[in-house]
Amino acid sequence: MKKTVIFTLLCVLLAMPAMAQPGYRYSRPRIQTVGHHGNEYVAWHRYYFGLRLGMNASHVSSDSPVLDGNGVKTGLNLGFAAGTQLTYRAPIFLESGLYYSQKGGKSGSGQDKFTYDLNYLEVPLLIKYKHFVGNQTSIQPYAGGYLAIGTDGSIKNYGSRTAFSSFDDGYFNRFDGGLKLGCGVGFNMLYVDASYDIGLSNIGQDDFNDTHNGCFTINIGVNF
């Protein structure tokens, strides 16, 4: 399942440059003076498509001592983004996309060590502001939320040397959602950003009540 999802996303990412329509220009917004009145912004960067590849550093917080710990799990973050300008008067954008995001965490040590992989298809919905610095560089703070559905994952108990399915065996709920905060930097077509997910949904079942995801992500990519 994991290989199928990653392969499908890679195919979409490779096909997107060919499908992208012109609509992204790499210059500072022009200012148009109207008579003797003030300045009026002219539309720029009306829409864009982007490819993203990065790394997650995730953890799970829980009222269960089995899950709650300081262990951070690293994983892949892969997907694409699409954005459109909301108003011609200011560089404010609405952005969404589709990502394959590997989350989870670790707890304990030695014979008491647990690791849990929680892999999701994730859809963010963000409001982004682009502040231009120079002609081709922009700083892009954003905030919003995300919804996700679990695709696969496993829980490994190193003490008993056993493994279970994270979602199919009744340990974790498949659905997750929360807040996403971050900031990106664009230079011409290149893009890099850092963000943090604050899980608001209780992803635990049965013994794992009151359990939430937390994830720090760094992405690099290109915009078309």
Q: For each of these PLM feature ranges, what is it?
A:
Residues 4-14:
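Sec-dependent N-terminal signal peptides
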Residues 16-20:
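Sec/Tat signal peptide C-region and signal peptidase I cleavage site
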Residues 21-74:
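Short glycine/proline- and aromatic-enriched beta-strand/turn motifs that initiate or cap beta-hairpins
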Residues 24, 189, 212-224:
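Outer-membrane beta-barrel "beta-signal"
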Residues 51, 78-80, 98, 123-127, ...:
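Membrane-embedded beta-strands of outer-membrane beta-barrel proteins
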Residues 61-67, 106-112, 153-161, 204-209:
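Outer-membrane beta-barrel translocator domains and adjoining extracellular loop/strand segments
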Residues 86-92, 113-203, 224:
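Outer-membrane beta-barrel transmembrane domain signature
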